[in-house]
């Protein structure tokens, strides 16, 4: 049998039906003629490339084994640059992942078989390269450790989603425990000592980076929230799995919080650090955090989008051979760290099984349809117009309110919905408690008119 790593591009393992390899006409690939979803499988180990059809106009290229490996990311990047340099007619765009590359193309301009031959040839050249290196900026970002916005998100999660989660009330304590670190200071030291390499952008939106420390001994691992948070402050910094992410916008989320930083996205594009693009970071940037107070971060976040806060950005190069040499030199320490970390991770999961936290099931159910107490003369009820959970009660019986004042805040469909006082008056009764389920039409507050 022919060795895939030495075969010529036109003879690589392919499941496409036989036909002219370089036809200038559009090629029709019949689904029923395909023997497997994989239409190309070449190379071995970290030089393996698998191609799958992804719809009618996309080709998904997967590199190596499904594991976190910087070598795979660098080779994927090199393949993307090689295909970009060819400026192929019919290729619309290229989208890189951590160990993948998706090719969006027009099959009527570039037949699939021809595209596969080109990909295989370029992959050969990438794998043969002896000195693979990329530009790698070092971007110094301020980090407000355990920022109040992160604490608020945890508080809200405990009130409306899951109060007994293993990562509550402190994500940092959870990170310490699941990584077998001696104290919270060591968690902080690890995060600030790490150099987080940006492996991908747009995780999940607005230029948010997915990054991991270059030194494996800085790779803190965590599980994600289950269920997910319904609210996360913009630019919160969290760890999920072995990846660090900066949330590009306010929204739901699941990564474990360490703090908050400045904006990753600037729609106005008028700040020098963004270099004319709306997203701040680039592939293979190295993020290095430095500590600031919560108040300092408020000022930085105010000034940065206006061009009044200058980032410290250094320019460097990341060389694959040098990085592999570093891993070899530090192999013993890296192996010991991973063994200790894995033991702590497994012990944490065993504790969840023992105490019943491993199989979480929401018990919030539906608010009981109890009979409402009748209103007295001069009273007015304030009813919920939507089903959800009660997040906050802003008033207490006896409080005087004016029309338009917020009485309670509901959470429904990952949105905060305030219920407002319809009249000037005095609060007579609050019939719900934070964290309780509320049905549509349920009476929540009773007011008496002035």
Describe each model-derived feature in a short phrase.
Residues 1, 284-286, 398, 404, ...:
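Loop/turn positions that initiate beta-strands
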Residues 1-4, 24-368:
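Conserved "landmark" site that anchors the functional core of diverse proteins
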Residues 11, 15-26, 44:
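Short, low-complexity intrinsically disordered segments enriched in A/P/G/S/L with frequent Arg
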Residues 365-408, 418, 424:
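Acidic, low-complexity mobile loops and tails
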Residues 394, 400, 429-432, 437:
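Exposed loop and linker-edge segments at protein-protein interfaces
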Residues 399-420, 439-450:
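Short hydrophobic beta/alpha edge segments that flank linear recognition/processing sites
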